[in-house]
């Protein structure tokens, strides 16, 4: 079972809900829930086959890119820098699973 992947998905999902409660951005909530769902489904697929990392890798790369750009623009660690950093770590972990 890919506990790290499921934890990452839960963090993304929880973060989108928390962001919605603080700021009230419905599009951000929908996007966060969708990306969290993709990350969770990707973790499920990795749980079944350790080499099936395509969806998880795509999701982490997408989130790292989007949040990395936000971090570069805002210079704020929370939440953009944290999510970008965690996504980069997730990418590294997934690539290592392929080796």
Swiss-Prot record:
Family statement: Belongs to the TMEM14 family.
One biological process term in Gene Ontology: negative regulation of mitochondrial outer membrane permeabilization involved in apoptotic signaling pathway
Membrane topology qualifier: Multi-pass membrane protein
Pfam family, one: Tmemb_14
PANTHER family on file: TRANSMEMBRANE PROTEIN 14, 15 (PTHR12668), TRANSMEMBRANE PROTEIN 14A (PTHR12668:SF11)
TM regions (residue ranges): 1-21, 24-44, 79-99
Protein name as annotated: Transmembrane protein 14A
Domain of life the protein comes from: Eukaryota
Keywords from the named record: Endoplasmic reticulum, Membrane, Mitochondrion, Transmembrane, Transmembrane helix
Gene (name only): TMEM14A
InterPro entries according to UniProt: TMEM14, TMEM14_sf
Function field: Inhibits apoptosis via negative regulation of the mitochondrial outer membrane permeabilization involved in apoptotic signaling pathway.
Location within or outside the cell: Mitochondrion membrane; Endoplasmic reticulum membrane
Principal location listed in the UniProt entry: mitochondrion
Any one GO cellular component localisation term in the record: mitochondrial membrane
Organism: Sus scrofa (Pig)
